[in-house]
């Protein structure tokens, strides 16, 4: 009898505990956004600045770029609303910047001396971190340091990790004239 009571009590405890754990793992739909500090905003802005620098130089064979993402992070480009190749995980992200198995060779924007600029950055807190939207400009196209092109915008999801703020996902919405593409 005591064994049956102990099992019944344990089962009842599990029935209460498991849903509570499951509920605690994901924020409720009406969960309040995190309160970001001024330092959080600065660190997220620095993440975007580091992104530009890593992309423009293919530093550390593209792994400096890849390490700006979470281990399961995703970069997803779109051109005029059409999805492009999806880059997920460290190796694929290094390739997105021209590195990894590509070895930073024949990277068009690097060969032209292009620099990426990210103005109009808006950061919004969420229950799990923050989201952001930022425009993208490219300067130096075709080797002309005075040529600037608007190349759409990014939608970002940021999360704070033990290593600092990282991209959980980054979607580039390229808006290009038909048939024109930076080469």
Each predicted region: which residue ranges?
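A solvent-exposed, acidic/Ser-Thr-rich amphipathic alpha-helical stretch
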Residues: 61-62, 66-135
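Bacterial N-terminal signal peptides that target proteins for export
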Residues: 1-10
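A beta-strand edge to alpha-helix "cap/lid" segment located at domain peripheries
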Residues: 25-35, 108-183
């Amino acid at each position: 009898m005591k064994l049956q009571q102990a099992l019944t009590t344990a089962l009842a405890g599990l029935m209460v505990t498991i849903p509570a754990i499951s509920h605690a793992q994901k924020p409720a739909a009406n969960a309040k956004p995190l309160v970001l500090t001024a330092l959080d905003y600065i660190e997220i802005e620095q993440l975007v600045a580091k992104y530009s620098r890593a992309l423009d130089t293919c530093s550390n064979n593209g792994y400096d770029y890849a390490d700006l993402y979470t281990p399961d992070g995703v970069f997803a480009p779109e051109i005029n609303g059409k999805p492009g190749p999806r880059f997920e995980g460290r190796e694929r992200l290094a390739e997105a910047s021209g590195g990894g198995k590509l070895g930073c060779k024949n990277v068009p924007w690097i060969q032209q001396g292009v620099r990426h600029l990210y103005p109009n950055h808006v950061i919004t807190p969420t229950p799990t971190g923050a989201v952001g939207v930022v425009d993208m400009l490219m300067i130096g196209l075709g080797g002309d340091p005075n040529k600037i092109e608007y190349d759409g915008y990014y939608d970002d999801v940021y999360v704070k990790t033990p290593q600092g703020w990282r991209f959980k996902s980054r979607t580039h919405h390229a808006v290009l004239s038909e048939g024109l593409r930076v080469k």
